[in-house]
């Protein structure tokens, strides 16, 4: 969401690229035409299979920021990811707001039987900037209310982290992912599958500039490179009721 959270942007006829509104939309239509004529014919068998059913490998909960493309980051094909996006990659605790995110989680777990749920934050997150400095949200009451689900992360950083100048945003971004993982575990469908060893959860932070992903490891309480040496960082709690 970039600077929209720190300064009220005045919309005009041109976009950040210097295009008019008509030119911006024409770019999207041209892209669709290329998809129809160049991409779809080569993937027609895949789309024919997907037209009948979906069986995604994972659920991917991430920010609405236009710079984050889950399928690109993970090199996934259509049908591989069940993606849910919102401002700040928020997962409301169960019962507080049983809306789009909560229903998507329940459907992914109970109907699609996903075996992995990834909560992915990212660098330069406008939502996290707004959590640190909410003054720019006065004209966006809905966003302000939504970001209250990030308050636990802000409070944790404020009371426990002696961050140097410029470090608070990165630390908050990581702590927000951990907080949303905690919220995720309050959902009955998730809690039951975790306890039975049928579901794994993952917390990632993606760096837009470098393409690096840091993953949360619950045992150490730290984030480590996803493609680093050694075992993969694991955010999943130990199962208590392993299926026979």
Walk through the language-model features, giving the residues of each.
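Divalent-metal-activated hydrolytic enzyme cores
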Residues: 2-56, 89-115, 126-244
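N-terminal active-site beta-alpha-beta segment that forms phosphate/nucleotide-binding
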Residues: 50, 54, 61-71
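Structural motif
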Residues: 57-60, 80-82, 115-118
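Short beta-strand segments
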Residues: 61-63, 85, 118-122, 202-207
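Gly/Ser/Thr-rich loops at beta-strand to alpha-helix junctions
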Residues: 65-67, 122-127
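Catalytic core of membrane glycerolipid acyltransferases/transacylases, capturing the structured
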Residues: 67-87
């Amino acid at each position: 969401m970039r600077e929209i959270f720190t300064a009220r942007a005045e919309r005009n006829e041109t976009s950040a690229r210097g295009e008019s509104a008509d030119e911006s939309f024409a770019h999207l239509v041209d892209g669709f035409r290329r998809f129809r004529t160049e991409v779809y014919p080569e993937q027609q068998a895949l789309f024919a299979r997907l037209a009948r059913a979906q069986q995604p490998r994972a659920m991917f909960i991430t920010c609405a920021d236009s710079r984050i493309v889950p399928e690109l980051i993970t090199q996934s094909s259509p049908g591989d990811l069940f993606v849910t996006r919102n401002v700040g990659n928020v997962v409301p605790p169960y019962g507080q707001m049983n809306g789009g995110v909560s229903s998507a989680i329940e459907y992914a777990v109970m109907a699609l039987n996903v075996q992995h749920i990834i909560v992915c934050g990212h660098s330069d997150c406008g939502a996290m900037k707004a959590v640190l400095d909410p003054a720019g949200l006065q004209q966006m009451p809905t966003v302000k209310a939504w970001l209250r689900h990030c308050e636990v992360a802000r409070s944790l950083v404020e009371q426990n982290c002696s961050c140097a100048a410029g470090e608070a945003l990165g630390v908050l971004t990581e702590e927000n992912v951990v907080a949303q993982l905690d919220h995720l575990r309050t959902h009955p469908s998730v809690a039951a599958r975790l306890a039975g060893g049928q579901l794994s959860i993952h917390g990632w932070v993606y760096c837009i500039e470098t393409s690096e992903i840091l993953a949360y490891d619950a045992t150490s309480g730290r984030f480590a490179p996803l493609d680093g040496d050694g075992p993969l960082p694991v955010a999943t709690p130990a199962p208590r009721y392993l299926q026979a």
